[in-house]
Amino acid sequence: MSYKQASSETIKEQVRRHYAERIQSGSCCGSPSGCGGDAVPTEIALYGEEVIAALPSGVVTTSFGCGNPVALASLREGEIVLDLGSGGGLDALLAAQRVGVGGYVYGVDMTDNMLAVARRNAEKAGVANVEFLKGDIENIPLPANVIDVIISNCVINLTPDKSQALHEAFRVLKPGGRLAVSDIVIDGDLKGFPVTEEQIRAALDWTGCIAGALTIDEYRALLIEAGFTDIAITVQHRYTINDVGAMLAGVPGGLNVLPSEVVQGLVGCFTSSTITARKPGE
């Protein structure tokens, strides 16, 4: 079997196309119960029934997350927040409610369909202190030192140049600013299998959220390299083979192209984890 890792621009185009299509179906990237089921119960598990019930109909089904970075961030009134890969806008809208009229939230996404849905959702929710910008998280369209808190939900795994994305996050944060991320993370590594790590990642496909996932050690190293301190990475949920299969539904490749012993060895490696860090300063 032949494997070849796609180029950075090819990966980004695949991600754009995949999520432009997925926004129509409301399917997600990952969840504590797997990604193949009903989106509303999944989001209730992540955010709580009261939070979800307070949102306009349809907002919840445009979520593609694997956690609740808004709660993780412990947002305060008046803070300026940036949501990296804001998708349909769920986390950005919840953050806007938390920071109040004295705060503001920016959402950045590179997919036009997502931006259109997010803006409609903001209008339906009557939230004015939020703005959705077209952009790449490897080149954030904001000046340096303007953001109090960065949140992101199951997105950093999708970007080809994670080092650049984290350097950009560090750049736009104010001194003392916080990073609060939910993401797919590998606990351990993908070595020791009868195929190479590159072959495993290529077979799983980038758009399924797991092919581009970092290991815990890799994530920590890149955060340190970018300048972050007070780094904490915590496993919240370990994905089963059924979970991973559901996450890969509708994308090329998948578990069926890997040897069975590799598939069994992957059980528990892929996790939904929280990542917090801080930019040194005030």
Name the predicted role of every residue range.
Residues 2-44:
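N-terminal auxiliary segments of SAM/dcSAM-dependent transferases
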Residues 81, 150-151:
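Hydrophobic beta-strand segment of the Class I
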